[in-house]
């Protein structure tokens, strides 16, 4: 036991762990938007407005996007980042940065008990020190149990007290089924405000495809006729049962 304690005391961060934790374990989505590295996003204005309305609140200002896989939850975050870059958000949100947090990377390589908690706490401390940052956690239901071991805390228990503090904001995304795991934890559930992201209609999907049409044409070096967009939405909705619009319609066009 003494040798293990000595090893832990002598432990130093690897080279990749030195430096700002947000740069190591996160991705600045607003920076990618500013550099033009994000795909253009279309539609979902209602969900975006609802999310911004929650973000500008004084309390209970942590939205979580709840919807089936492929309906465009991450696209809403990218659209939000683009709006920030173009100053098309309420003044309270101007100049904010959206940083996507990679929980898997925080967990990866944790060799000692308490190392995950140390990494995660470093990230939270940096966010609290920079109130302009909004963190985004995809598959946020995974925070329950992430990093937990006998005698240690999981990410949810570390995050819960921080969510109620001013100067810290978090956006989550998860599926309808997995959100039930958050609902089972009353303390965590009341800190998040769910936003239902429904599957778009065929007409809404066609509008999204029209927006993506120039980038798809440029990538494949072809001309995509308007009828093909309508047909991909109709046929994918009719014959592909295990996936959701607009993702499956985009894949039909991309694979054709």
What do these predicted regions represent?
Residues 218-227, 231-256:
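C-terminal helical "lid" subdomain and adjoining coupling/linker elements of P-loop NTPases
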Residues 108, 125, 197, 221, ...:
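Amphipathic alpha-helical interaction elements
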Residues 96, 104-115, 200-205, 232:
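Flexible, glycine-rich beta-alpha linker
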């Amino acid at each position: 036991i003494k040798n293990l304690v000595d090893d832990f005391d002598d432990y130093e961060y690897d080279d990749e762990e030195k430096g700002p934790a947000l740069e190591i374990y996160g991705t600045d989505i607003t920076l990618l938007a500013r550099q033009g590295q994000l795909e253009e996003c279309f539609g979902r204005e209602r969900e975006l407005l609802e999310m911004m309305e929650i973000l500008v609140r004084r309390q209970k200002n942590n939205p979580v996007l709840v919807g089936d896989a492929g309906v465009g939850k991450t696209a809403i975050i990218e659209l939000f980042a683009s709006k920030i870059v173009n100053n098309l958000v309420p003044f309270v949100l101007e100049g904010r940065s959206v940083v996507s947090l990679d929980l898997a990377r925080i967990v990866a390589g944790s060799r000692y008990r308490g190392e995950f908690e140390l990494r995660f706490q470093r990230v939270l401390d940096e966010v609290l020190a920079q109130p302009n940052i909004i963190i985004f956690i995809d598959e946020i239901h995974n925070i329950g149990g992430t990093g937990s071991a006998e005698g240690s805390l999981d990410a949810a228990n570390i995050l819960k007290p921080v969510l109620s503090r001013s100067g810290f904001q978090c956006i989550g995304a998860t599926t309808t089924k997995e959100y039930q795991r958050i609902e089972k934890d009353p303390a965590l559930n009341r800190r998040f405000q769910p936003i239902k992201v429904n599957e778009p209609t065929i007409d809404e999907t066609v509008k999204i495809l029209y927006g993506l049409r120039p980038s798809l044409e440029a990538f494949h070096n072809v001309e995509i006729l308007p009828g093909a967009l309508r047909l991909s939405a109709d046929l994918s909705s009719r014959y592909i049962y295990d996936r959701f619009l607009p993702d499956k319609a985009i894949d039909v066009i991309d694979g054709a």
